[in-house]
Amino acid sequence: MPPTIEVPVLVVGGSLVGMSSAMLLGHYGVRSMVVEHHRGTAIHPRAAQITQRTMEIFRTVGVEQIVQRKSSEQFVQDGAIMGVETLAGKEVAYYIANLNEGIRDLSSCERVFISQSLLEPLLKQRAEELGAELRFATEMISFEQDGAGITAQIRHRDSGDTATVRARYMIAADGAHSRVRERLGIRMLGHGAFSNSITI
């Protein structure tokens, strides 16, 4: 049986929240392991608007400028968000006429548009530079919590190889339908989805 892998923090989920967590931990000298069931970073645009507070955090960990550069390859920096009936149809409303209107009075960082498929690789690279161990195509299949931390079983989706991970802390970054949160009995409250949208 392979030896137990010991790491201060196990991050379950390697999308925007998981990668950002790993970057911040690494920035402050804390090692982490990220397990993500997908085989790589996002391949679809998905989320696109990054707030100025997030950009302030990205500045702290050294990725603000590269995120801005990558964003400017795709989007107008002070662009708008609008609603339409169809791609060629009637304009319904402008939700935001200028993404950064008033923002420069509040922060030295700006909001940006950048598709998730472009952002995740940037966060992945920085997390690795700061010492995170990233395991894609890997899922957490179970965990037990005690007074000193957690013991988790992880499995590679392709090979079927399993390993035991012992961590002082675990971050549940596995999305809106989090299995970790469900296992811990943490419920989501609220009205649920307000709308559906597609980033193009």
Regions found by a protein language model. Name each.
Residues 5-7, 159-169:
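Core beta-strand elements of the Rossmann-like FAD/NAD(P) dinucleotide-binding domain
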Residues 65, 116-118, 184-200:
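Central beta-strand plus flanking loop segment that forms part of the substrate or channel wall
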Residues 136-151:
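A conserved short coil-to-beta-strand element within the FAD-binding core of flavoproteins
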Residues 4-34:
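N-terminal Rossmann-like FAD-binding beta1-loop-alpha1 element of flavoenzymes
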Residues 172-186:
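Flavin (primarily FAD) binding-site architecture
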Residues 13-18, 168, 174-175:
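Conserved phosphate-binding and hydrolysis motifs of nucleotide-dependent enzymes
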Residues 43-47, 51-128, 144:
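Active-site-adjacent segment of FAD-dependent monooxygenases/related oxidoreductases
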